Amino acid sequence: METAQHQQNNQQHYLHQHLSIGQGTNIEDGSNKNNSSNFMCRQNSTRWTPTTDQIRILKDLYYNNGVRSPTAEQIQRISAKLRQYGKIEGKNVFYWFQNHKARERQKKRLIAAATTDNTNLPMQMQFQRGVWRSSADDPIHHKYTNPGVHCPSASSHGVLAVGQNGNHGYGALAMEKSFRDCSISPGSSMSHHHHQNFAWAGVDPYSSTTTYPFLEKTKHFENETLEADEEQQEEDQENYYYQRTTSAIETLPLFPMHEENISSFCNLKHQESSGGFYTEWYRADDNLAAARASLELSLNSFIGNSS
């Protein structure tokens, strides 16, 4: 009897355990199914696609009615009104107003920055590689011109300001230092007292002078002056040595005797210090001496020296 009761108790305990396990698994499976269905619903309900009517009402509230940061109560009323035109929640209304305010602030900053740049652009001077550059649309470059100045190409290694000085000088023309084809030709003068001068400034003293041959005019004139002085000295020395060497072998020129048209006479004298001869021409100042027109040659010293 005891063994039979013990077996029945074991069977009941076994059945109870299996039933409880089965119910637990069913409960767990049901909860998992419910969780998965809820997750799918959340994925489908997270994204909000507004309709044209909803966007129109929201913009009207934002721009025309001045609603920028609606309260919770206002959000509920707005969302309830917008549900008539499509699916919408309160959080969608809240985020729409937040995003719209952020975009508007960003747009205002960009517009302010662009306005500031456009205002300061005509007034600012750009410094680039040692060259001051003004606005290219400066009317002075188009209103007044510098005749005789032709500069087709330029670079940005230095600046040369060439302008007209005088009665008709207008402004200055900025030319760069590495001009390859830069020439200055004199313009036509308007009258005898109007003249044109060209001045240059801002030239690098250590730059090559072959680019600007006209800038070396002072040095060129100095060199010409020195060369002219040297040539004059050489000519004077050559003339001196030539006179010293030729004075000893000087021959007497042939002069016509008693010529009526001669108004002067020549006197040949002997120079004892050098051993040579030199001639002296005398022009008659009075009419009587000119009418006489006699040529006197004193050869006494020459005869005495030869004897």
Curated annotation (Swiss-Prot):
Chain segments annotated as coiled-coil in the UniProt record: none
Family per record: Belongs to the WUS homeobox family.
Main subcellular location: nucleus
Pfam families found in the cross-reference section: Homeodomain
The name this protein goes by in its record: Protein WUSCHEL
GO term, biological process aspect, one: plant organ development
Claim: DNA-binding is one of the keywords in the record: yes
Region feature (Disordered): 23-44
SMART domains to which the protein is assigned, alphabetical: HOX
Domain of life the protein comes from: Eukaryota
Localization per Swiss-Prot or TrEMBL: Nucleus
UniProt GO MF annotations: DNA binding; DNA-binding transcription factor activity
Species for this entry: Petunia hybrida
Protein role: Transcription factor that plays a central role during developmental processes such as early embryogenesis and flowering, probably by regulating expression of specific genes. Required to specify stem cell identity in meristems, such as shoot apical meristem (SAM). Acts in parallel with HAM.
Tissue: In the active shoot meristem, it is specifically expressed in a small cell group underneath the presume position of stem cells.
Family matches, as Gene3D superfamilies: Homeodomain-like
GO CC terms of this entry: nucleus
Keyword Transport listed: no
Keywords: Developmental protein, Differentiation, DNA-binding, Flowering, Homeobox, Nucleus, Transcription, Transcription regulation
InterPro entries: HD (IPR001356), Homeodomain-like_sf (IPR009057), WUSCHEL-like (IPR044555)
Signal peptide: none
